[in-house]
Amino acid sequence: MTESNILLTGKPGIGKTTVIKRTVELLSCSSTGFYTREIKRGDPRVGFEIISLQTGERLPLAHTDFTTAEDRVGKYGVKAENLLGFLKEINEAMTSNKPQCLVIDEIGKMEFFTPGFHETVDKAFQSSYPLLATIMKKSHKFCDYLKNRGDTDVIEVTENNRDDLPEKLAKRIEEQL
């Protein structure tokens, strides 16, 4: 069986998001979902923003300035509600008949605060569409469940493979459509 779900994992800063973005650029089909990018103020990282692959819309997900946020991961306050519109795009894509790749960057602690996140991710894994996602490396009940699915291939991004992965992944995704 060909694994239709691809999970990229690896150390922070190794290039998982870069692999996602380059893979999406190589695809001839459309992609629906989002990727996450660091927000920097000078050199230090002060937060993360989420960017829609469909519309280019950008919203902050977590920031050191979100001091009153109830949800927190380390020094970052999390605005989980900012992810809701991006989840809606993925849910709508799963009801269409359009050939496409679903993209979720990232399945991790900050995103878990968003109502409906677990359900949308689970539906994406069960859908007929190829899924390309990044996932936290550390053990977590939901993440371990996803990593151990029979229809999922977990690939660790390293300095040795990160430059070659986008072309290989794009070819594999195109073959599934």
UniProtKB/Swiss-Prot annotation:
The keyword Hydrolase applies. It comes from Natranaerobius thermophilus (strain ATCC BAA-1301 / DSM 18059 / JW/NM-WN-LF). Keywords: ATP-binding, Hydrolase, Nucleotide-binding. Coiled coil: none annotated. It holds the Pfam family NTPase_1. ATP binds at residues 10-17, 101-108. This is Nucleoside-triphosphatase THEP1. Belongs to the THEP1 NTPase family. CDD domains: RecA-like_Thep1. It comes from the Bacteria. SUPFAM superfamilies: P-loop containing nucleoside triphosphate hydrolases (SSF52540). Signal peptide: none annotated. One of its GO terms (molecular function) is ribonucleoside triphosphate phosphatase activity. Its EC number is 3.6.1.15. It catalyses: a ribonucleoside 5'-triphosphate + H2O = a ribonucleoside 5'-diphosphate + phosphate + H(+). Has nucleotide phosphatase activity towards ATP, GTP, CTP, TTP and UTP. May hydrolyze nucleoside diphosphates with lower efficiency.
